[in-house]
Amino acid sequence: MINLKLLESNYENFVSKLRGKNINEDVLKSLLDTFNELKKQRQILEDLQAVQNSKSKELGALARSGGDVAGLKEELSKNKEALGAQNEIVRTLEEKLDNIASNVPNITDDDVPFGRDEEDNVCIKKVLNPREFSFTPKAHYELGEQLGWLDFERGAKISGSRFTILRGEAARLSRALVNYMIDFNSARGFELVNVPFLVNSNTLYGTGQLPKFEDDLYKVRDEDLYLIPTSEVPVTNIYNDEIIDAEILPIKMTCYSACFRQEAGSAGRDTRGMIRQHQFEKVELVSITKPEQSEQILDEMVACASDLLASLGLPHRHMLLCSGDLGFSAAKTIDLEVWLPSQNKYREISSVSNTRDFQARRAKIRFKDGKKNALVNTLNGSSLAVGRTLIAIMENYQRQDGTIEIPSVLKRYM
């Protein structure tokens, strides 16, 4: 959630930055007007409460002295009614404010380029040159079906579209990738954690998936439980509503999980193969930091994911996302895109984001800063998406006869 006090004091800056995320100024004006009205009504409530307290003391003193308390009792009764009505006004405004604020995205960092969509993202680095093939490279789904690695037909029979069964060497390679990624991230100082794949609505609110993106989530019927869209959600919320000792910051964690997404806005996109699935696996990085640490930690997380790709011999590039392509909670995001020979282009395989204090404000994650409590910064990123890494290896390491070479760093994990 954005800082409403900063919105009040720096309104034009918020309007400018959120315009880049396609937020109309009318939304911010409504938010600020509601915030100011709530402050006004809270002051009225406090004044009424002060009167109630004062009159109650006066009544007690008058009763002890044997004076006539009838008139004062009537005043207290009327003031109590006014208090009740004012409480309802404040409660309604608080609900309205939360409804507006919880749907407003994070503002962008100053170095995020203004743009409309992915066409306006900026390439800031390329790592490894794409391989030159002496034959026409096949797509991963062609290779997978020929080798008996990927069973799309039976996956669809069991679960429907956008589900795949990995068999034999593909299943082993996928498991090898998970173990290698965990070991690689752990060696960079990220603590391995294992979390639930089902979380409640408060948890999803904390990281920004609810209420805005409920249509993309799988909900358990008649329960306040959802399947996680990414392990960023439970891992970040490990510290939900906690005050962390500043001495242990930054906290750096890595986590393997299955992820589940409706892909509600992806109809007709990537319908063949494993690029876009309802269920997929990912190894995630999450960091919780002091505000002054988060830019350095973002660089470290990007380097970790990039070095992991490089260790697998996979050509990729770093993309600084423009304002219009940024996620809801992100202030700044670096995407890593891996080269896919069959498509002759780069595709996203990791997205590393700094959310500043946006998620921390929603999830109430604080640290002890001297004598006062302050909000942490939270960061998250894939290191890496397992299925897309499998795809990239299949396509970049394919031989002319349709077999797949296994990257040397993975052989001991197979």
UniProtKB/Swiss-Prot annotation:
UniProt-annotated binding residues for L-serine: T230, S231, E232, E284, S382
Protein location: Cytoplasm
Binding-site list for ATP: R261, Q262, E263, E348, I349, S350, S351
EC number: 6.1.1.11
Enzyme class: ligase
Domain note: Consists of two distinct domains, a catalytic core and a N-terminal extension that is involved in tRNA binding.
Family, per entry: Belongs to the class-II aminoacyl-tRNA synthetase family. Type-1 seryl-tRNA synthetase subfamily.
Its biological purpose: Catalyzes the attachment of serine to tRNA(Ser). Is also able to aminoacylate tRNA(Sec) with serine, to form the misacylated tRNA L-seryl-tRNA(Sec), which will be further converted into selenocysteinyl-tRNA(Sec).
Quaternary structure (record): Homodimer. The tRNA molecule binds across the dimer.
Protein name in the entry: Serine--tRNA ligase
